[in-house]
Amino acid sequence: MEEDNMRGMFRAVLCCLAVLIVAPASAAEKLRVTKAVAFAWTFTPLDVGMQMGIFAKHGLEIEASAAAGDAKMQQALTADSTDVGIGSGPGMAFMTKGVPAKAVAVMYGVPKNMAVMVGYNSPAKTVDDLKGLKLGVTTVGSLTDWIGKRINNLKGWQGSTGITTVPIGGMPPARAAIKTNQLDGYIGALEAGYALEEQKEWRVITGAAPFVDHFITHVFFVREETIAKRPEVVRAFLRGWMETIAFMKANKDKTVEITSKVVNIPPSVAARAYDEQMSNFSLDGTFDPKALAVLKQSFVGMGLLKDIPENDVMFTTQFVPVK
C-alpha cells in the first residue's frame, strides 16, 4: 500500500514538472505599431529597439508596419488596423475630425530631420527660388504639407504664386514625378535628400528647422480604446522607446549599422543623420507649451482648421513624463 502511495506521489510530481516545462512564460503583449512612412531615419528607433531586444525586455511583441503618409496612418488608426501610430505633430489636427486616437507623448522637437529638395539640375538655388514651384508631400495635412504651407505663410506667398504642395506619397512616386518634370521638388526626410545628392539626382535647398523656433515634429498616437483598456502596454512601449533612445545615444556605430539598412541609405549618410538629428529626440515625451501654441495657431493660420482646438481633443498627458 505504501509502495502504491509512493508511486502515485511520484507520478503527481512528474505531472507537475511536465506542466511547468510545457507552460510558456508570461506571454508578451502584442502591439501593432505603424510608422507614417518607411523611409524616415527618425522613425528607426522602433527598429533598433526591436533588433536589440529592448521592447521585448519590456514585455512587448511589436508588429511593425509603415504607411504612405500621415493621413494613411490616421486611416489605419480609425480602422483599428494598428494600435500605435508614429506620426507628425501637425497630424494632431486629425483628432478634431473624428480619428479615435490621441497623441500620448512627443517623439521629436524642432524639425531638424526635414528638408525641401529639388531636382539636381533645377535652377532653384535658394528658398526664394521655391516661389511658384510644385513640391511633392506625403499626404494632405501631413508634416511635409505643413512645412510647405509654413514657408508660404512666412514669405507672404499666396495661392499659386507660392509653393504648391502636391500629395504624392512616398519616395518612389516622388522620384518618378521629379524625373518626368511633373514636380519641381519634394519635402521629406533630410537624409533622403543627402543620399540622392550623392547620386546627383536631388539637391537639398534648405532644412525645415529655420522656419520654426518651437515645434512638435513627431508624436506617438494611440487609439483611445488602447489607452482605456491597455494603459500599461502604452507605458511599456514609451519606456521601451526612451530606453532605445538612450541606447542609440551611447552606441553610434551600432545605431548607424542598423538604421542604414532599415532606410536603405549609405552608412555615411546614416552617420550624418545621427550627428544632426539624434539630439532632438524627446527624452521624456512632455508636450512643450510654446511648441503647442505655435502648432495650434498654425492650424488656423494655414487654413487646416477654423478654430484653435482644445488640448484634450488632440492629446493626453497621462503618460508623460515617461519614467
Task: Name what the model sees in each region.
Residues E29-S160, T165-G170, A177, D184-E191, ...:
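Short, glycine-/small- and polar/acidic-enriched structural segments
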Residues G89-M92, P172-K261:
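Pocket-lining segment of extracytoplasmic ligand-binding domains
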Residues A12-I21:
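Bacterial N-terminal signal peptides
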Residues I21-A28:
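Sec/Tat signal peptide C-region and signal peptidase I cleavage site
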Residues M1-M6:
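Short, Lys/Arg-enriched N-terminal segments with co-localized hydrophobic residues
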Residues M52-G53, Q75, A79, K102, ...:
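Solvent-exposed, polar/charged alpha-helical surfaces in well-ordered, non-transmembrane soluble domains
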